[in-house]
Amino acid sequence: MKRPVTGKDLMIVNMGPHHPSMHGVLRLIVTLDGEDVVDCEPILGYLHRGMEKIAENRAIIQYLPYVTRWDYLATMFTEAITVNGPEQLGNIQVPKRASYIRVIMLELSRIASHLLWLGPFMADIGAQTPFFYIFREREFVYDLFEAATGMRMMHNFFRIGGIAADLPYGWIDKCLDFCDYFLTEVVEYQKLITRNPIFLERVEGVGIVGGEEAINWGLSGPMLRASGIPWDLRKVDRYESYDEFEWEIQWQKQGDSLARYLVRLSEMTESIKIIQQALEGLPGGPYENLESRGFDRKRNPEWNDFEYRFISKKPSPTFELSKQELYVRVEAPKGELGIFLIGDQSGFPWRWKIRPPGFINLQILPELVKRMKLADIMTILGSIDIIMGEVDR
């Protein structure tokens, strides 16, 4: 990094990679003029594990456990994008029941990710109380994950053509109870945080990104929607069954850290709406053991219908990826998570390029922190929402 040529004595400060507010092993080399930030250079790569190269030497079913280590706080999305590519290449249909369950799991994962963004973000700017509140709600989400998948994190639940297992008995009722409970807690967050004058002083007008600037930088997710661009891939691409539910894109015009907070808080409420609709309209209803009911051909022949299955005809472990190129994407909690996939008539992908939202969104950080105070770095970095496992891959 070049030192600015000025007559002032500048100070160069290392932040990270072990700083608690870095949200992983991120290092920032910050040039300061007193308390004012003159320059900032992010140093990445401390958590690089060669995830793209590993994909080229694994079949898709072998690679699935690896992808949950990208964004380890929203693992359902990395699994979804990993199976969506081969499904499109092989023209594999997903049963409607499996698609609905996928939507439920994705939105629960979105809520868990936003919750674990909110707590540390508030702690970064000096508010400790919400940090403990969000873990209370997050535990309920992880209990639902554990009951359905067997794991609190790193679920390995998605499969090509469906999901690994149907929902256990009583899971739907527990999830509906959580939805009713969580809506009241969001109101509590708004009372505790949104109207707090100290919080507003720290985030209002800090880290402003205009709509055109956000597009030029390639930002996505809450970073883009908080800048006045109502762009959400769930509406644009209509993947899974999102077009069958009633919900609204949450966006703000201000483009500052407060706007990004408001977008994420509103998104959690919209996710609850989607989950409630998916649970109430789940093909096959609340009776979960549909696989055994399918054998009872005399009384209920309709249970053999394709839409009631949780997984379609399973592809073989040597499932070949046809010789073509494909880009697939999903709306992850942090933005557009995409994969550029090149098949080569082999069980292994010839190229597996990951487009992580955190890596793209992080590029604007040096521009946002210039001419700001040193203390504002934590606010701006926290509002971007990054996970270094996804950034470095």
Swiss-Prot record:
<dbReference type="Pfam" id="PF00346">
    <property type="entry name" value="Complex1_49kDa"/>
</dbReference>
<comment type="function">
    <text>NDH shuttles electrons from NAD(P)H:plastoquinone, via FMN and iron-sulfur (Fe-S) centers, to quinones in the photosynthetic chain and possibly in a chloroplast respiratory chain. The immediate electron acceptor for the enzyme in this species is believed to be plastoquinone. Couples the redox reaction to proton translocation, and thus conserves the redox energy in a proton gradient.</text>
</comment>
<keyword id="KW-0150">Chloroplast</keyword>
<protein>
    <recommendedName>
        <fullName>NAD(P)H-quinone oxidoreductase subunit H, chloroplastic</fullName>
        <ecNumber>7.1.1.-</ecNumber>
    </recommendedName>
</protein>
<dbReference type="InterPro" id="IPR001135">
    <property type="entry name" value="NADH_Q_OxRdtase_suD"/>
</dbReference>
<dbReference type="GO" id="GO:0051287">
    <property type="term" value="F:NAD binding"/>
</dbReference>
<keyword id="KW-0874">Quinone</keyword>
<keyword id="KW-0934">Plastid</keyword>
<dbReference type="GO" id="GO:0048038">
    <property type="term" value="F:quinone binding"/>
</dbReference>
<dbReference type="InterPro" id="IPR022885">
    <property type="entry name" value="NDH1_su_D/H"/>
</dbReference>
<keyword id="KW-0813">Transport</keyword>
<keyword id="KW-0520">NAD</keyword>
<keyword id="KW-0618">Plastoquinone</keyword>
<dbReference type="InterPro" id="IPR029014">
    <property type="entry name" value="NiFe-Hase_large"/>
</dbReference>
<comment type="similarity">
    <text>Belongs to the complex I 49 kDa subunit family.</text>
</comment>
<comment type="subunit">
    <text>NDH is composed of at least 16 different subunits, 5 of which are encoded in the nucleus.</text>
</comment>
<dbReference type="GO" id="GO:0019684">
    <property type="term" value="P:photosynthesis, light reaction"/>
</dbReference>
<dbReference type="GO" id="GO:0016655">
    <property type="term" value="F:oxidoreductase activity, acting on NAD(P)H, quinone or similar compound as acceptor"/>
</dbReference>
<keyword id="KW-0521">NADP</keyword>
<dbReference type="GO" id="GO:0009535">
    <property type="term" value="C:chloroplast thylakoid membrane"/>
</dbReference>
<keyword id="KW-0472">Membrane</keyword>
<keyword id="KW-1278">Translocase</keyword>
<keyword id="KW-0793">Thylakoid</keyword>
<dbReference type="InterPro" id="IPR014029">
    <property type="entry name" value="NADH_UbQ_OxRdtase_49kDa_CS"/>
</dbReference>
